[in-house]
Curated annotation (Swiss-Prot):
Disulfide bonds: none
GO cellular component terms, A-Z: viral capsid
Entry-linked Pfam families: Gp10A-like
Family as reported in the entry's similarity comment: Belongs to the T7virus major capsid protein family.
Organism whose genome encodes this protein: Enterobacteria phage T3 (Bacteriophage T3)
Subcellular location per the Swiss-Prot or TrEMBL entry: Virion
Entry remark concerning the domains of this protein: The N-terminus interacts with an internal region of the major capsid protein subunit in an adjacent capsomere (intercapsomeric interactions) to stabilize the capsid.
Role of this protein: Assembles with the minor capsid protein to form an icosahedral capsid with a T=7 symmetry, about 60 nm in diameter, and consisting of 415 capsid proteins. The major and minor capsid proteins are incorporated into the capsid in about a 90/10 ratio respectively. Once the capsid formed, encapsidates one single copy of the viral genome.
Protein name: Major capsid protein
Keywords tagged on the record: Capsid protein, Virion
Domain of life: Viruses
Presence of keyword Cell inner membrane: no
GO biological process, one term: viral translational frameshifting
Length: 347
């Protein structure tokens, strides 16, 4: 049967000198009733590391005190001959500067718009600063693990950071989520012992890892889920604790902190996560499986806490929303930090 001739096609009949490729161009777009905002990003490090506030100044000092030993005193001996001085040093965290994120909303566009954007813009500004702080803390944790041998202890004898390499299974492959999960759990067993050997408290230990590796741990535990009810919730797909570590999945594990620009790859990025592993860089983006720590391993110093400011820009006929804070991040205790990494390709 031949195609019918004629018939209205409203979208293409747009008057003299007008044409449109879209035959539906003139039809009304009805508001769907929901604005598809970006999924919320949540800070994971803030409650899991040290936070200190200062009223003024450019940095905060954290004194470090070493250990001493006891010795028997025989009759006639002098304590002055046996005394061993307790060493002292310090860790200093500097304020990075004023970190900001802002948006400018023009009056005319606000008047034309049929849905609210201010609440979502405000949320996104706050999230961007929270993600920058998270990335900086995780990068500093990696930096502790990458300290050179000559400076990887605050005071000699207090303990060094731990780097553990996944062991390839005798059968199977680390590309199999179940085998990968088993390998990670095996290294967390060693990580637990390493921290305890450094006298790190058993409480407040955390293991940060990617969603892929988090899921691999779940896959390894699932066959025996009935025996591990205290460790995981199979229904929700969440892990509570493994080997004394709170397991936290972090999509932005290797993102690093903010820089001088707001691009995806910011210029002059502060607290950058190492990109490539080498003989001197033990933990980097290309080999990290996860980072483990005690909450005292890394610290954040706040000079100005997160705040929102609204300003009228009359010369632009617009409203400006600004999110800001002034903080600094730094490593404090190398002995309370560690990482699990992938084996080298040659291994």
């Amino acid at each position: 049967m031949a195609n019918i001739q004629g018939g209205q096609q409203i979208g293409t009949n747009q008057g003299k000198g007008q044409s449109a490729a879209d035959k539906l161009a003139l039809f009304l777009k009805v508001f769907g009733g929901e604005v598809l905002t970006a999924f919320a990003r949540t800070s994971v490090t803030m409650p899991r590391h040290m936070l200190r506030s200062i009223a003024s100044g450019k940095s905060a000092q954290f004194p470090v005190i070493g250990r001493t030993k006891a010795a028997y005193l025989k009759p006639g001996e002098n304590l002055d001959d046996k005394r061993k001085d307790i060493k002292h040093t310090e860790k200093v965290i500097h304020i990075d500067g004023l970190l900001t994120a802002d948006v400018l909303i023009y009056d005319i566009e606000d008047a034309m718009n049929h849905y609210d954007v201010r609440a979502e813009y405000t949320a996104q500004l706050g999230e961007s600063l929270a993600m920058a702080a998270d990335g900086a803390v995780l990068a500093e944790l990696a930096g502790l693990v990458n300290l050179p041998d000559g400076s990887n202890e605050n005071i000699e004898g207090l303990g060094k950071p731990t780097v553990l390499t996944l062991v390839k299974p005798t059968t199977g492959s680390l590309t199999d989520p179940v085998e990968l999960g088993k390998a990670i759990i095996a290294q967390l067993t060693i990580a637990r012992a390493s921290l305890t050997k450094n006298y790190v408290p058993a409480a407040d230990r955390t293991f940060y890892t990617t969603p892929d590796n988090y899921s691999a741990i779940l896959a390894a535990l699932m066959p025996n889920a009935a025996n591990y009810q205290a460790l995981l919730d199979p229904e929700r797909g969440t892990i509570r604790n493994v080997m004394g570590f709170e397991v936290v999945e972090v999509p932005h594990l290797t993102a690093g902190g903010a820089g001088d620009t707001r691009e995806d790859a910011p210029a002059d990025q502060k607290h950058a996560f190492p990109a490539t592993s080498s003989t001197t860089v033990k933990v980097a983006l290309d080999n990290v499986v996860g980072l483990f720590q005690h909450r005292s391993a890394v610290g954040t110093v706040k000079l100005k806490d997160l705040a929102l400011e609204r300003a009228r820009r009359a010369n632009y006929q617009a409203d400006q929303i600004i999110a800001k804070y002034a903080m600094g991040h730094g490593g404090l205790r190398p002995e309370a930090a560690g990482a699990i990494v992938l084996p080298k390709v040659s291994e």
